[in-house]
């Protein structure tokens, strides 16, 4: 009798627990069904409510309008983000520090370039283009440099001594593409924005026609060439400050070979911003270099390999002498 009472008493808590669990599960299911029903009634599911999309568009436009109200002006071209002067100063400072410590992150370089592209520099570049017939045509036609526009398959079939094949070969060797160039975002004037976009897109042609790779020393040399030739502020900053983080052997190569070459070539060459590269793809690359006043520097990769081999050979001789 006592055992039976004890069994009944022990079973009651278990039944209570099971009933409570079933009740909670039922509330969860019923509550979920109720929420689904409410969502369907509002048109949140399957867009059954005809006003749903219109409401969503209104909410999106309201958010965008709220964002526009915080900007100093309305956007003046696709992708334009107007900044206040203090935001530009902050962008310059932060992107400058990030570019110095993390030059491998291309977005840091992109933001620093636009932050440093002050209007007086861009206006000077515009006057340079307006003073030249080809430059004026570039401003008028505003061509775009991309793989589809250039027809890379066609460039691959061109004779090896042409600019087009040289450009194609350099892109494939370095594993890059002109399509990776970021759009201009923070420059306010639409004409200035296109000029900076053009400068940015032509950067790979400067590499290809000089044969300089995209390793850090090659980038610094091309930046120094750009600074001397067209006066790009960010390029000048890069040429001056970037070598500070390099090893002694790298700084020595830049100081003795590539920076003197870049400054001399940049100052003596024709303004590269006025070159309509897309129309010269079938031209002989050596003849084009002569016309532009560009002298090819020593092969950077080859010099690096030769110097590395000499250091290794010297180290082996020293170690054998020690033993």
From Swiss-Prot:
It is an enzyme of class 4 (lyase). One of its GO terms (cellular component) is mitochondrion. The keyword Transcription does not apply. GO terms for biological process: ubiquinone biosynthetic process. It is a peripheral membrane protein. Pathway: Cofactor biosynthesis; ubiquinone biosynthesis. InterPro entries: Coq4 (IPR007715), Coq4_euk (IPR027540). Belongs to the COQ4 family. This is Ubiquinone biosynthesis protein COQ4, mitochondrial.
């Amino acid at each position: 009798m006592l055992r039976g009472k004890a069994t009944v008493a022990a079973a009651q808590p278990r039944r209570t627990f099971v009933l409570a669990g079933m009740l909670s599960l039922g509330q969860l299911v019923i509550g979920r069904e109720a929420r689904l029903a409410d969502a369907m009634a509002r048109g949140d599911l399957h867009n059954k409510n005809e006003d749903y999309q219109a409401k969503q568009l209104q909410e999106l436009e309201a958010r965008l309008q709220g964002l526009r109200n915080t900007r100093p002006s309305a956007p003046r071209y696709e992708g334009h983000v107007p900044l206040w002067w203090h935001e530009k100063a902050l962008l310059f400072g932060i992107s400058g520090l990030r570019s110095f410590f993390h030059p491998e992150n291309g977005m840091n370089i992109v933001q620093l370039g636009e932050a440093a592209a002050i209007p007086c520099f861009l206006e000077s570049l515009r006057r340079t283009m307006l003073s030249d017939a080809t430059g004026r045509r570039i401003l008028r036609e505003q061509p775009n440099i991309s793989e589809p526009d250039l027809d890379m398959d066609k460039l691959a079939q061109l004779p090896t001594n042409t600019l087009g094949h040289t450009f194609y070969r350099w892109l494939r060797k370095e594993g890059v593409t002109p399509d990776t160039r970021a759009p201009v975002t923070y420059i306010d004037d639409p004409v200035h924005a296109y000029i900076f976009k053009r400068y940015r897109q032509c950067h790979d042609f400067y590499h290809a026609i000089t044969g300089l790779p995209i390793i850090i020393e090659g980038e610094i040399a091309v930046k120094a060439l750009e600074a001397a030739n067209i006066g790009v502020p960010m390029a000048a900053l890069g040429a001056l400050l970037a070598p500070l983080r390099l090893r002694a052997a790298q700084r020595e190569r830049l100081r003795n070979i590539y920076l003197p070459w870049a400054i001399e070539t940049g100052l003596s060459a024709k303004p590269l911003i006025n070159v309509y590269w897309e129309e010269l793809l079938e031209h002989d690359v050596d003849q084009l270099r002569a016309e532009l006043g560009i002298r090819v520097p020593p092969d950077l990769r080859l010099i690096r390999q030769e110097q590395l081999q000499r250091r290794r050979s010297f180290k082996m001789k020293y170690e054998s002498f020690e033993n």
